[in-house]
Each structure stands twice: as C-alpha cells, then as structure tokens.
C-alpha cells in the first residue's frame, strides 16, 4: 500500500498548493523580491501626453444595457477628442443597433451573421487605428479613472497588456451565485496583483483589459476564452501583463447557480483548450518565471487538481483500513467529510435562498471543481464547431 500512500500525499500536496500554497509562496517571493528591488514610481501622464485609444465593446443582443453603457463611457475621465468608442454587434437581432444609432459618439460595426465573440474581435480590430485598445463588456460599469490608470500602466514599455480588476456587485438579497462569484474574484484579484508584482499577471478578464494594438494576434474563431488567449499570446511575444486594481469593472453576479454553472463549464472547457493552444508557455527554459506562474495559477486548476481533489476521499478511505497509522488517516477523512458536509449544507441553503457566507465557501469551491470536470464533456461536444458563439449566462 506504499504506492497508494505516496499517491495520496502527492495528491493532497497538489490540491493544497493549487488553492492555498501557491498564494502563500507567491506572497513570500514578492516580499523577497521587493526587499532587493522596489519598482520605481512612474508619473501619471498629463492630458496632452495621453495617447488616443479605442474602447472596444463586442456585444450580442444587449439592448437593455446599451444606453447605460454609453452614459458610462462618456462619463470616463479621458479627453473626448482622444477616445473612440467602437461597438461590434454582429448577429444582434434585437434593438441594440437601433439604440446605438441615437449615440453619435458610437462607431458601430454590424453584420447579420453571428460567429461568436472571438470572430467579432478579429473583425473589429482592423478598424482600430489607435495605439491602445481597451476591451470591455456591455454589461459592466467602469470607474471614472479607469482609462487614465490603464494608460499609466502602459508607461512601462515592457507592458503589453493591462488587466483591470473585476468586481461583482453583491447585495444582501443575492444568492450563492453572486456571493460565491464575488468571493472568488476577491481571491483571484489578490493573486493577480501578487503575480504582477513578481513578474506578470497570468491572464486578463474580458470585463476590462487593454493591449497595445500592434501586439494583437488574431485567434481561432472557436476560441472560448478570448481574453485569456489574447493576453497570454502577448506574453509569448516577450511582454508582461500589468495588473491595475485602480481600473475596475463592476457587474452583477449570475442570476442563479444554474446560470453560474453555464459560465463555469464554459470557462473550464476554455481553460483546457487554452492549455493546448498555449503549450509553448510550458517551456521553463524559454519563459522561466512566467512558466512557473502559469502552471501554478492556471494549468493545475484546469487539468489535474480537480481530479486529485475528488480522488482524495476514496484513497483516504482505503488507507484507513490498510496502513499502520489508521488514526492519522481517520482524522484526515473526518476533515474531508466535514468539508463535503458543509458544502452540501451550503447547497441546501442556497436552494432555500438562505445566505450563509461560511457555508457558501465550501459549496462554491466544490461547485467550481465539479464544473471543471464537466468542462471536458463540453469541449468534446464542441469538437469540430468552428464558431466561438456560446449561450451567455443571465445576470442578477
């Protein structure tokens, strides 16, 4: 049974490292680095030094939020003569284009065929003439200083992409979907900030990120995580991804856990797809520190850890009856059983619309990992589908 014991402890270590250990190690490495070399402060560019930029919004049937989004765009603290607002509304068959026609500041590209968001990005980028392009979603609200903060990050010539912060608007009445997603993004934002301080953030969220126009590489139209693929291909070109917490996008959480499940399964499938398409980044001799960050922060989560997580309990059960130290394994088994029990209780309460943050954590954690497994099936079903179109989750 030595082999099973070794497998158990390796699995336990990988699960711990993926979700907790990497964050701890990352924090230590950042502190060590900054003891020897602190980043030099860069001044905020004056108005006359601000570059022209394009705010790029790929939208499909967003009639309900068009006016609110345009109001938000025009309220941003950036010179109007240096800001272009580009909408790509391919496939939209509601009143999105009609509403946009009332806004002379909006440049609208539309074709009747819906080919997915990635195809819309590939098409729209040819109409971008500014050195910087900021991508954002139609249903998100940007803070007033977002564009200036993003431009500030680009004053470092090594930075090829800037990731803004994603925030979930959570109200007391919200369900487990909003509460769980909000907690997840707070943790994820902390990791991104530490990643960027060590070397580079590992990806950007599509709600708000920006790239240098010259570094944009067209993607396969069946790409599921366009924001992730696009940002990491910029790293492959020798640039870094800066993280800017002072530029943030706020959106509502998913309407319910069924809608959140759609998102998580698609993201998991997109993660698996991304690992294959970004496989050169797995070369530590070429990408060094970033390879370590990429594997620790993303690859393990999407490829291996969820399998090992659910393998731990049956392995643990076997080891209780087959090793010379059954008490140790019995204690670990009880801790696992308690965690699963709390997750199940959290699920029950969410069905009753009763909010309990303590129980939402194990529930949402297990929910995410179950949907990573479902991502394999989602990706298999899409095999041969050249379109990146997907059913978007309803927001609260």
Regions of interest found by a model, annotated:
Residues 20, 25-52, 258-259, 280-290, ...:
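Juxtamembrane C-terminal module of membrane proteins
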Residues 51-54, 84, 229:
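Cell-envelope/extracellular polymer assembly enzymes that use nucleotide-activated donors
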Residues 54, 72, 86-97, 113, ...:
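A conserved acidic beta->alpha catalytic loop
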Residues 64-68, 82, 93-102, 145:
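Acidic helix N-cap motif at the loop->helix transition within catalytic regions
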């Amino acid at each position: 049974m030595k082999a099973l014991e070794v497998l158990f402890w390796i699995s336990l270590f990988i699960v711990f490292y993926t979700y907790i250990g990497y964050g701890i190690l990352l924090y230590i490495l950042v502190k060590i680095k900054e003891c020897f070399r602190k980043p030099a402060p860069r001044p905020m560019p004056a108005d006359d030094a601000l570059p022209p930029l394009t705010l790029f919004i790929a939208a499909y049937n967003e009639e309900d939020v068009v006016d609110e989004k345009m109001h938000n765009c025009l309220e941003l603290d950036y010179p109007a003569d240096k800001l272009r607002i580009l909408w790509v509304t391919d496939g939209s068959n509601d009143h999105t284009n009609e509403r946009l026609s009332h806004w002379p500041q909006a440049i609208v590209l539309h074709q009747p065929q819906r080919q997915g968001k990635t195809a819309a990005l590939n098409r729209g980028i040819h109409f971008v003439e500014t050195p910087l392009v900021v991508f954002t979603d139609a249903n998100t609200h940007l803070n007033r200083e977002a564009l200036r903060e993003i431009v500030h990050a680009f004053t470092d010539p090594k930075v090829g992409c800037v990731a803004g912060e994603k925030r979930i608007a959570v109200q007391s009445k919200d369900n487990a979907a909003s509460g769980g997603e909000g907690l997840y993004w707070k943790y994820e934002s902390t990791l991104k900030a530490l990643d960027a301080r060590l070397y580079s953030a590992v990806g950007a969220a599509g709600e708000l990120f920006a790239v240098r126009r010259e570094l944009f590489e067209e993607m396969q139209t069946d790409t599921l995580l366009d924001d992730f693929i696009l940002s990491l291909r910029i790293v492959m070109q020798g640039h870094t991804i800066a993280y800017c917490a002072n530029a943030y996008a706020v959106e509502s959480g998913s309407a319910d856990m069924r809608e959140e499940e759609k998102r998580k399964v698609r993201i998991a499938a997109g993660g698996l797809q991304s690992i294959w398409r970004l496989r050169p980044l797995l070369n530590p001799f070429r990408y060094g520190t970033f390879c370590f960050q990429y594997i620790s922060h993303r690859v393990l989560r999407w490829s291996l850890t969820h399998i090992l997580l659910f393998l731990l309990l049956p392995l643990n059960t076997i080891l209780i009856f087959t090793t010379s130290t059954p008490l140790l394994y019995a204690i670990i088994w009880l801790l696992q059983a308690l965690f699963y029990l709390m997750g199940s209780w959290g699920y029950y309460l969410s069905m009753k619309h009763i909010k309990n943050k303590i129980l939402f954590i194990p529930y949402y954690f297990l929910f995410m990992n179950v949907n990573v497994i479902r991502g394999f099936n989602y990706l298999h079903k899409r095999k041969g589908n050249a379109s990146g179109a997907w059913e978007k989750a309803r927001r609260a």
